Amino acid sequence: DMAVLDYAAEQYPELPLHLSVQGSATNYETLKFYKNNFGIRRAVLPRVLSLKQVEAVAQYSPVELEVFAFGSLCIMAEGRCYLSSYLTDESPNTCGACSPAKDVRWEQTEIGLEARLNDVLIDRFEEGENAGYPTLCKGRFKVGDKTFHAIEEPTSLNTVELIPQLQAAGIKAVKIEGRQRSPAYVENVVRTWRRAIDLYNMNPEHFRVKKQWKEDLAKVSEGAQTTLGAYTRSW
């Protein structure tokens, strides 16, 4: 919310201001703009950047950087995607979520568990099938004579194995999705990540990702599968 950001910077100059990922700051020139005009101290980078791009931005960034570490994977350029607004009539930038809780509805039917967003069917799950949070980009749709995830399958971002590289790049904080998640989810993920970061800081040279960490995080992963997302892309 640019108006709130401007008001806070003008009226409370000592208030620590963090730029949301919805600010879509993908380069250091953008970060410099927000730093010079609003005095931000930290920014959350979008999930579309590769690790090399994160390192390049961090090298010249005038503010602290925070990156996504675990949670729902987004393949869109955050802050610039309005796909869900065609169903909800609200921008994710102003309501804070692609699928506002008030628009989400689950319905058990004779042919499966249906997920609806503002009453529009976006997926149907068979008994025993893992169900992801209903977002339009991860819905299953009929294209031609086939029904499948036309844009993206439900998958969770898990970068625990990148802790050494992220610290080396100078990243100050990792972001774990907690909004619209259960307390049990948050407790499990935060506990595992706390252990991993502490172990790395104790002995960086001998850091290895533990099998138990992967198993614990897999239990709460969307779609029961994880990925490093854009961090390891080559283009």
Which sequence ranges carry the predicted segments?
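Non-catalytic positions within long, well-ordered alpha-helices that form the structural scaffold/packing
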Residues: K35-N36, Q167
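Active-site pocket-lining/capping segments in soluble small-molecule metabolic enzymes
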Residues: M2-A25, V44, V48-A173, R179-W235
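Conserved N-terminal glycine/acidic-rich loop preference
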Residues: D1, E29-K32, I40-A43
